[in-house]
UniProtKB/Swiss-Prot annotation:
It catalyses: L-threonine = 2-oxobutanoate + NH4(+). Homotetramer. The keyword ATP-binding does not apply. This is L-threonine dehydratase biosynthetic IlvA. Keywords: Amino-acid biosynthesis, Branched-chain amino acid biosynthesis, Isoleucine biosynthesis, Lyase, Pyridoxal phosphate, Repeat. GO terms for biological process: isoleucine biosynthetic process; L-serine catabolic process; threonine catabolic process; threonine metabolic process. Residues 333-404, 427-498 form the ACT-like domain. Its cofactor is pyridoxal 5'-phosphate. Pathway: Amino-acid biosynthesis; L-isoleucine biosynthesis; 2-oxobutanoate from L-threonine: step 1/1. Catalyzes the anaerobic formation of alpha-ketobutyrate and ammonia from threonine in a two-step reaction. The first step involved a dehydration of threonine and a production of enamine intermediates (aminocrotonate), which tautomerizes to its imine form (iminobutyrate). Both intermediates are unstable and short-lived. The second step is the nonenzymatic hydrolysis of the enamine/imine intermediates to form 2-ketobutyrate and free ammonia. In the low water environment of the cell, the second step is accelerated by RidA. It comes from the Bacteria. Gene3D superfamilies: 3.40.50.1100, Biosynthetic Threonine Deaminase, Domain 3.
Length: 507
């Protein structure tokens, strides 16, 4: 089917019984930073918080009445499932929804809420492709009509109405429209419409690095099935793209860019700062891709449109997003630093951090000769981490830059510590101090040099006050003097030396 055939299907698509024309909203802060006008096509504001409602309803509106009466079935990573459930409830038909077991609970609950008693939810497999295989078996057993999440002309046309709205809402020059890609339905529909109406506008697909089936397929010239897919951007975790979507993307798409998890987290934060809305990872793909493209191509004063495709975010994922956004936006650098285990070296190292805001500081005495510190600091530009590491090295502190090391960011930062045979006469304290620039360095400066620091843990949580865990080696003979030191210190504290968890894991 050529683009002009899809043009007719898109123009006559039945989506507005359930969906509405979403805003094309300027992202003012992001535009200023990228030096390019950026507009967000706010599909995250649809009734199911995702664009998927368009294609699902359009497909179901074209199913013959007798087949529709028997019921429909679909497989989905979550958002299409909500679209089918919502449409089924509106049409008064039964629907079976198969979702992967990895689907966020917020999406599973929403499917049931939108569909009501007429919807049956089955969880099967770890990815969309696994759920799809199971759905085909159920379809054959029950004689249901399958509503494909992306590889169907009516679904593609329904998603293509987004492009129709964008070009009507912004009739001036547009350099590129960025769309997320899982199976390719949205990208295929948008590209087919744009190339039929405004062929000078680029359409760029965006995928997660660990779920880039379309990028690999276009590079190979044929559909490539991935052995595994990453699940952070669960809404686009597709192992094999559709036949029709691949054909259309191969013909009309101008390219695909891939982004990592940190870039996705940074994009979620960017959209929040401009709109006060929280996108899901897949919903932020287009924004992350637009940022990467603008930086890579070195463009300025070019209008960029990003489709914010969904906002079905699990609340408990937000902490991870907040932490990783700093690295993705080149605002945090992470290092492992080795310092000599001698009096004054800890404080000397801290002085090198200077006026930079410390985001994390983990240390545990482990060796009589040297100590290893895990430290995070805020940075202002890409590449600054290399300068900081070089400065540490020039002052005799062996340094490893871990800013882009996945193991360190995901696990090691939480595992620094443990029992130490060298932590003799250790007493453990939680200190509280106001969270402001320079406050950590001021606290460290107030630590008396008479007692060795054997443990130190700090993480900036974004609160107005922070808690620091400090272990100090205080011989029995020094207890009276140490108590006077604590009283004069001026920071609220709680001694945790008798804490059961400390006794089990650290003492």
């Amino acid at each position: 089917m050529a683009s002009h055939d899809y043009l007719k299907k898109i123009l006559t698509a039945r989506v507005y019984d359930v969906a509405f024309e979403t805003e094309l909203e300027p992202a003012r802060n992001l535009s200023a930073r990228l030096r390019n006008p950026v507009y967000l096509k706010r599909e995250d504001n649809q009734p199911v918080f995702s664009f998927k409602l368009r294609g699902a309803y359009n497909k179901m509106a074209h199913i013959p009445a007798d087949a529709l009466a028997r019921g429909v079935i679909t497989a989905s990573a979550g958002n299409h499932a909500q679209g089918v459930a919502f449409s089924a409830a509106r049409m008064g038909v039964k629907a079976v929804i198969v979702v992967p077991v990895t689907t966020p609970q917020v999406k599973v609950d929403a499917v049931r809420a939108h569909g009501g008693p007429g919807v049956e939810v089955i969880q099967a497999g770890e990815s969309y492709s696994d759920a799809y295989a199971h759905a085909l078996k159920v379809q054959e057993e029950r004689g249901l009509t399958f509503v494909h999440p992306f590889d169907d002309p009516y679904v593609i046309a329904g998603q293509g109405t987004i492009a129709m709205e964008i070009l009507r809402q912004h009739q001036g020059p547009i350099h590129a429209i960025f769309v997320p890609i899982g199976g390719g339905g949205l990208a295929a529909g948008v590209a087919a419409y744009v190339k039929a109406v405004r062929p000078e506008i680029k359409v760029i697909g965006v995928q997660a690095e660990d779920s880039c089936a379309m990028a690999q397929s276009l590079q190979a010239g044929k559909r490539v099935e991935l052995a595994e897919v990453g699940l952070f951007a669960d809404g686009t975790a597709v192992k094999l793209v559709g036949e029709e979507t691949f054909r259309l993307c191969k013909e009309y798409l101008d390219g695909v860019v891939t982004v990592d998890t940190d870039a996705l987290c940074a994009a979620i934060k960017d959209v929040f700062q401009d709109t006060r809305s929280v996108l899901e990872p897949s919903g932020a793909l287009a924004v992350a891709g637009a940022k990467l493209y603008a930086e890579r191509e070195g463009i300025e004063n070019q209008t960029l449109v990003a489709v914010t495709s969904g906002a079905n975010m699990n609340f408990d994922r937000m902490r991870f997003v907040a932490e990783r956004a700093e690295v993705g936006e080149a605002r945090e650098a992470v290092f492992a630093v080795t310092i000599p285990e001698e009096r004054g070296s800890f404080k000397r190292f801290c002085s090198l951090v200077g006026d930079r805001n410390v985001t994390e500081f983990n240390y545990r005495i482990a060796d009589a000769q040297s100590a290893h510190i895990f430290v995070g600091v805020q940075i202002r530009r890409r590449g600054e981490s290399a300068d900081i590491a070089a400065n540490f090295e020039s002052h005799g502190f062996k340094t490893a830059d871990l800013t882009h090391d996945e193991l360190s960011k995901e696990h090691i930062r939480y595992m620094v510590g443990g029992r130490s045979p060298l932590a003799l006469d250790e007493r453990l304290f939680r200190f509280e101090f106001p969270e402001r620039p320079g406050a950590l360095m001021k606290f460290l400066s107030s630590m008396a040099p008479d007692w060795n620091i054997s443990l130190f843990h700090y993480r900036n949580q974004g609160a107005d006050y922070s808690s620091i865990l400090v272990g100090l080696q205080v011989p029995q003979a020094d207890h009276a003097e140490f108590e006077r030191f604590l009283a004069a210190l001026g920071y609220p504290y709680v001694e945790e030396s008798a804490n059961p968890a400390y006794r089990l894991f650290l003492s």
